[in-house]
Amino acid sequence: TFANGERFTFPERVAVPVDHPFAADDPAALMVDNMTLDVLFGMVLPRYSLSGYVDRAKAKSWTTKEKEIVEHFDRARSNAAAFVRTTLLKRLSSGGYAFTLSLRRHVARNELFLHAIDNGLALPTGTIQESDLLDDDDLVEHDVDDVERLNDAAAQRYEALANDTPDYITWVRPDLFTRELRASLVADTDAIRALLSLYGDWDTSRDSKLAELIKLIEDTHPADKVLVFTEYKDTANYLAGALRAHGIAKVDAATGDDKDPTQLAIRFSPKSNVSLIPDGESVDELRVLISTDVLSEGQNLQDAHIVVNYDLPWAIVR
């Protein structure tokens, strides 16, 4: 029963898979090639296994603080790299844009480390939490959270990070590590850059997965409300921008960055949220809402006609 007393019945749920072939010029067609998987599984990911690069021959010169840092590296060495690799694979399944953005961020952070090593500057290491690894970045860091910052020189990003040190950053002198750390960083960076060069610049017009979503919204369900779930805010924001650019009206995205995602739920589903709308106020209604799991629990979205899981990891039970 709705808040106004009107009764309703839930429609029968019909799961319809949406298959699409990759267009010949779609960069995603190259991303699902074995070459991509070989690089992902072949990367050393040294920033997430720093314990293996500690120069233990110099242990007698370590300060008490450095001994504690090394102990932390040793405790964290087992799972961090595996989580990062898994996250990259999940981003690949989400879409080419999110995947290439993660690769670019990874390169940028490697370059920041290399800049520090080559200039004898302290390395910004941090606490790695599972929640960070499963979020939009392989590690949530202020240096390259903003997509625009990816084009900054490593020296600029290093200076910005040094001037605004997050609480989770621990600065470590480069002499604490062996030369192999630099070699591994260079090897991973070169391998990723080769992939990015192969893919070329991301072009929305060649994104066949996006094209299939547009077809579903415009042709298959032109008059229906469409709710799209994705695990990543990068994908959500990308899709919202691409749909608007294509000319689809009344589109928005809800992510963890929104201060009040409930307002987006109300705009998308005003009928089922009528009790939350002040008397006499109108609602700028949405037809298409793209959301991360920020709206997966505790929100009324019953005005939706079509629910799309853009990437597989979304949990239907939520």
What are the language-model segments listed below?
Residues 1-259, 294:
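Helicase motor interdomain insertion/brace
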Residues 236-240, 278-279, 283, 290-304:
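SF2 helicase motor core recognition
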